[in-house]
Curated annotation (Swiss-Prot):
The lineage of its organism: Eukaryota, Metazoa, Chordata, Craniata, Vertebrata. It comes from Danio rerio (Zebrafish). GO terms for cellular component: mitochondrion. The keyword Magnesium does not apply. CDD domains: 17beta-HSD1_like_SDR_c. The keyword Calcium does not apply. Its main location: mitochondrion. The gene is hsdl1. This is Inactive hydroxysteroid dehydrogenase-like protein 1.
């Protein structure tokens, strides 16, 4: 009995001496939970404000807000085509730039017939260097350019070790994903600055937040587009030019069956994605453009890099 009494007495003494520490830990835990709750509520508010509220209000007059013409660079890409159609739906005329006219001529004809706006095609292969800029400069000189949409070239997304890539593929990655965006932005931005209005939208990839093995050059080029957009925002955002970085995850495309995922809630069609993305223009400077993708991005940011690397290695090896 004495041993039991001694243990109980010892326990009470220890508990009494540690009570201050326990209260401190409880306070720290409460503060942590409160901060997480505030962050969660803020994220929910941002999600609703960005993706749901704009789709409930009436359509904006984009031509009056930004300008009458849009340049779509990389117009052969599925998202870029859909974005051009969405702009045309709002009465915006489009200039489709691609290295192969045959890949965008049908899109231009469809836009003109369905929406009654002008659609011009320009062939510009940036693998040829600065000479690719001349036809673009001539075409936009007399136009009220209000939008510039630069889309990354998805055909360069090759799953190979870096040293296995040919020089032509590497130059293509640099010229068509980096040089094209930089040079066309340089052509379009002065007119926007002069008018004090305009929008530059750079479409890259949500995968730019972490490195991707076997896609080193491609993933680095998407990170460039994101960083370039954010830098331009801080340089010219206070002068009437809205610069947005779009960071989508997987989007269904018109590629042959089996080479692209079918459209679903998590993998939207280009048309669904473009409709959601355009509604975020003028609201967010950096977004996935589609609310399920924003939820994906939240998970990606919380994921330790070693977990991401393990998953990306398995995925890229499978593709």
């Amino acid at each position: 009995m004495a041993a039991v009494d001694s243990f109980q007495l010892l326990y009470r003494e220890i508990a009494r001496s540690c009570s201050g520490y326990v209260e401190t830990l409880a306070l720290v835990g409460a503060c942590y939970m409160a901060s997480k709750t505030v962050i969660f509520m803020r994220d929910c508010y941002s999600l609703i404000r960005l993706y749901f509220v704009p789709r409930l209000v009436r359509h904006r007059d984009l031509s009056q807000q930004y300008g009458q013409w849009a340049i779509i660079c990389g117009a052969s890409e599925a998202i870029a085509k859909a974005y051009a159609e969405e702009l045309a739906r709002h009465g915006i005329c489009v200039i489709l730039i691609s290295k192969d006219l045959s890949s965008v001529s049908d899109t231009a004809r469809l836009i003109s017939n369905n929406y009654g706006v002008e659609a011009i095609c320009i062939e510009a292969d940036f693998n040829q260097g600065p000479s690719a800029c001349k036809p673009i400069k001539d075409a936009i000189s007399s136009k009220d350019i209000g939008f510039l949409v630069n889309s990354f070239d998805g055909t360069l997304e090759i799953s190979q070790n870096f040293l296995e890539l040919s020089e032509s593929v590497l130059w293509g990655t640099i010229n068509r994903n980096i040089a094209a965006t930089t040079l066309v932005t340089r052509l379009a931005l002065p007119a926007m600055m002069e008018k004090g209005r305009g929008a530059v939208v750079n479409i890259s990839s949500g995968h730019c937040f972490h490195p991707i093995p076997r896609k080193a050059a491609f993933s680095a080029s998407t990170a460039f587009l994101d960083n370039f957009s954010r830098s331009l925002h801080y340089e010219y955002g206070d002068q009437g030019v809205f610069v947005q970085s779009l960071l989508p995850f997987r989007v269904a495309s018109q590629r042959p069956e089996g080479s692209a995922p079918p459209a679903s809630w998590l993998v939207p069609s280009p048309q669904v994605y473009a409709s959601h993305a355009l509604s975020t223009l003028g609201i967010s400077h950096r977004t996935t453009g589609y609310w399920p993708h924003s939820m994906q991005l939240g998970l990606v940011k919380m994921m330790p890099e070693w977990v991401w690397m393990l998953g990306s290695r398995v995925f890229t090896m499978a593709t």
